[in-house]
Amino acid sequence: MSVPQDVSIFTAYNANVDAITKLNGETIQKLINEFGEKEIAERIEEYPREIREPIDFVARLIHALRLGKPTAVPLVDESLNSWFDEKFEYELERLGGQAGIIANVLAGLGIKKVIAYTPFLPKRLADLFKEGVLYPTVENGELKLKPIREAYRDEDPLKINRIFEFRKGTKFKFLGESVEVPASGRFIVSARFESISKIETKEELRPFLDDIGKEVDGAIFSGYQGLRLKYSDGKDANYYLRRAKEDIISLKEEDVKVHVELASIQDRKLRKKVITNILPIADSVGIDEAEIAQLLSVLGYRDLADRIFTYNRLEDSILGGMIILDELNFEILQVHTIYYLMYITHRDNPLSEEELMKSLEFGTTLAAARASLGDINRPEDYEIGLKVPFNERSEYVKLRFEEAKTKLRMREYKVVVIPTRLVPNPVLTVGLGDTISAGAFITYVNYLKRH
């Protein structure tokens, strides 16, 4: 399949600086020795859900390393920025945040037009976007699309997320035993300060969203996990979600297909607000299997959610996906997991199952190329992904899917499941789910244009 270059996409809202540190056994051991095994073990028991002091970070990190499990924990105390900057050296800074990552991947692919919007654009962030990415501004009462690197505002706040990458096989001692990290992954300390948590389109740009809609075929929205329930100025999540809905509606009035890339939302109340406000007006929604369970739990399907959390069976995920699609009534659900990708849509979707399959294959191939190279800089880079084999559980995935078809009533749906291409030693792991979603969505939109 070739790169669908005749597609134009708008992405919003979240982009940030990712500062990356590669962890080794020595660094981990130093942290354990500094904070004390007993104190760390006690804090692991308490299981802090956010980082308010350094030991919260160390406890959650050690817990994640023992399980070999990718984890993200919000940092809520802005004053800890200096502690992290003094304690760790960053190997590199790159663009993070779903909207930012997706904009750069699509610009690298050379699609027709990429417009990225984030409410905060300090220079340090703007410089990390690729050439070719445009930013919407208003000049003399008109919409002007400027190269994003030139559109920065010095006074804007900076969001920096710290990513601690760990490798399978890294060893350290904890509580008298030798621990070997069972799988590679990353531990993300995500900045969640109030100054950067107002997810919105700024007032002066809002009247021009329909003009942006005329420029693009599709829009990818993300970043709602950064919202707060309450703000010190009296506003709340409902205020920002109302505005976010208006943004989506403005674009849909111009026949723009809207994809929402969901991310894990720790706060149950906020999760429910985002799910019930935003997802029903989207066309396409991208999630992973943990988020299937979170969605089902919000929608009242606790038993099925628990089954997915506990057993992680494909047939449960398919059943859960069909329920989500029906309850929230959007067009297509896209699920990305480490071993398989899945589309669930209603039977009347204009795309054939073969086209849906090709769309997912484009997504996993693009992600494999990015994992192999570390970045997508030109359309030909996509072809590197074609050399990456499908993962070792491919046959098992196919078998499980065939079994699920015999057990579930799927007549009213089109369900497509494909195995993922898995790079054994990835140069990069951050944002691969977003890359899959972006690749799948642009091919989906491209097929719809043909129909």
Curated annotation (Swiss-Prot):
Biological processes, Gene Ontology terms? fructose metabolic process; glycolytic process
- Which positions fall inside the ADPK domain? 1-450
Pathway(s) served: Carbohydrate degradation; glycolysis
Which of UniProt's keywords are assigned here? Answer: Cytoplasm, Glycolysis, Kinase, Magnesium, Metal-binding, Transferase
Q: Which GO terms describe its molecular function?
A: ADP-specific phosphofructokinase activity; magnesium ion binding; phosphofructokinase activity
Q: Which residues form the active site?
A: D434 (proton acceptor)
Q: Which reaction does it catalyse?
A: beta-D-fructose 6-phosphate + ADP = beta-D-fructose 1,6-bisphosphate + AMP + H(+)
Signal peptide residues on this chain, from the entry's feature table: none
Class of the enzyme per the UniProt entry, highest EC level:
transferase
Against InterPro entries, the record matches this protein to: ADP_PFK/GK (IPR007666), ADP_PFK/GK_arc (IPR015990), ADP_PFK_arc (IPR011790), Ribokinase-like (IPR029056)
Q: Which cofactor does it need?
A: Mg(2+)
Q: Tell me where in or outside the cell this protein is found.
A: Cytoplasm
- How is the cofactor bound, in the record's words? Binds 1 Mg(2+) ion per subunit.
GO cellular-component terms in the record? cytoplasm
Tree of life domain: Archaea
HAMAP family given in the database record: ADP_PFKinase
UniProt function note:
Catalyzes the phosphorylation of fructose 6-phosphate to fructose 1,6-bisphosphate using ADP as the phosphate donor.
Recorded family membership:
Belongs to the carbohydrate kinase PfkC family.
Protein name in UniProt = ADP-specific phosphofructokinase
Give the source species.
Answer: Pyrococcus abyssi (strain GE5 / Orsay)
